[in-house]
Amino acid sequence: MTSILTNNSAMAALSTLRSISSSMEDTQSRISSGLRVGSASDNAAYWSIATTMRSDNQALSAVQDALGLGAAKVDTAYSGMESAIEVVKEIKAKLVAATEDGVDKAKIQEEITQLKDQLTSIAEAASFSGENWLQADLSGGPVTKSVVGGFVRDSSGAVSVKKVDYSLNTDTVLFDTTGNTGILDKVYNVSQASVTLPVNVNGTTSEYTVGAYNVDDLIDASATFDGDYANVGAGALAGDYVKVQGSWVKAVDVAATGQEVVYDDGTTKWGVDTTVTGAPATNVAAPASIATIDITIAAQAGNLDALIAGVDEALTDMTSAAASLGSISSRIDLQSDFVNKLSDSIDSGVGRLVDADMNEESTRLKALQTQQQLAIQALSIANSDSQNVLSLFR
């Protein structure tokens, strides 16, 4: 039926045109934004996941920046420790040179003093962004330094920041700013050489292990010698010594003990001191810390071997600290690479969820444009029906 009040054909054509126009708007929006899911109304589940992951990716970007800052701190500390190790090696070499007979210890001490000043400069300069890992206040115990290492969201949705910790303690800092517990300002304990000797007491021979000294130790301590007997008047090695089986050991007056006499100077009968004071010590304090080395002082000059052993102990701790810093630096580099890859993976995953396929969208737009033209043509034809009715009355 043809009606001049209701044009069903035009209404159908108009509805189709509106639908096509709406689809074109959606397609053009996806093309202009590049997103298939641009809002929660497009796909609530995908939009929620994408929004959360984008937030996490921003946090990872901050982690990446923090890792760069942490790497700079660690690298600064490592470089300082590495330089300090080389300086301490030089100090050790100077001390070894000082053991030679006839050397000018005062001149060697001048060089050592310059090297000690260099160590102080290295420790003070090894600072980045206001943090120094080579010197610290250890009065309250070890100090923990942390570097941000990661951002984690667990299966329950809870988030946390992971950190890489490094302890500043007596074995890792060069100087304790409030005490003497750093590697360079503490006195190390060193092991003393020993010798096991048979000692006859009242006809019974027993084995005793006692501290052993070489003749150079005694000479450096300004000892006076009388055959197999020596006396050191003052300093760290002050006391009496006798030579037994090629080793110099602490001596004791044994006139009333029944012990075998090793040396008789006509006044005193000397034997091996088998008491605690004559036993070998495994925790003998070195004469000085590296920071207080002064071989012009008799107590240090007379015990250079122990001083060198103390420096060697310090080098061991410094090497260990440098190794720890190196391992942390390597870990930070690995973590940085991982964070970069993780960030790329998140970007890729979010893209799969919400990005528009531009090839598909452009093809769809072309089809919709064609449909729109056809719908406009159909609407035009439908609207012309009323004109055809009018012509019947002419």
Swiss-Prot record:
Compartment(s): Secreted; Bacterial flagellum
Chief place of localization: secreted
Keyword flag Secreted: yes
Keyword Membrane: no
Function field: Flagellin is the subunit protein which polymerizes to form the filaments of bacterial flagella. Homomer of FlaA is able to form a functional filament.
Family that this chain belongs to: Belongs to the bacterial flagellin family.
Name of this chain's protein: Flagellin A
Species of origin: Rhizobium meliloti (strain 1021)
Taxonomic lineage from the root: Bacteria, Pseudomonadati, Pseudomonadota, Alphaproteobacteria, Hyphomicrobiales
